[in-house]
Amino acid sequence: MKLNSFSPLLEDDDELHLPELVYWASLGDVEQVEQLLAEGTDPNQTDDDGYSALQAAAENDHLAVVKLLVGKGANVAYKGEYTALQLAEMANHDEVVAYLKSL
């Protein structure tokens, strides 16, 4: 995996196995997520375990990234072990929950 030069992850990260979009979404980095989407990255990208960028953003309370991903076509109903909504609910992220329920 190749991340931007300022990324704290190594190019060949054997521990996390996070694709770029999932990684930046989990950190709430709107600019990096926008850049990847503009370059054609699938908004439904998942890691090896099926954890999506939308799930990562929702679970970590990054509403702006959640909205961006949804606006670019991320599947709100996608369910690995849990949906993005379920993850946000379990983490008590009320604004993310309210937004996802409004869709």
What function would you assign to each model-found segment?
Residues 32, 64-65, 95-96:
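Conserved ankyrin/ankyrin-like repeat signature
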